[in-house]
Amino acid sequence: MAYMDVFVGPVLIADKDAYAAYARMMGELTLQAGALSVTACWGSDFPDGMANSFASAVKLQPGETIVTRFVRWTSKDMRDAAWAEMMKARDMQSGSMPMPFDRTRVIFGGFEVLGEE
């Protein structure tokens, strides 16, 4: 069954270019590891929900926007194996990949794909 990783987090609007470069680099890394597709998105519209919202979920601050990233895998097993290998990469271990966002406010999870139209 297809599997999707979903990441949501805040990024300073002024860091759009830095985030785009980071997203491209991570996209290449995950595709090389076996992902079927990677989609990175720059936020533009975050309406308030009745009980929660994207903005409150990531504790959005003034001057920030929200980014999302969707990584599609053939299966959860493929994703788990790929992430285990990616975490062994020198760049991932050395911290040489600066992350242009506040990692403490990122939310993420894995989802079984139920359908696509």
Each language-model region and where it sits:
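Residue-level signal for secondary-structure boundary sites
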Residues: D15-D17, D77-R79, E116
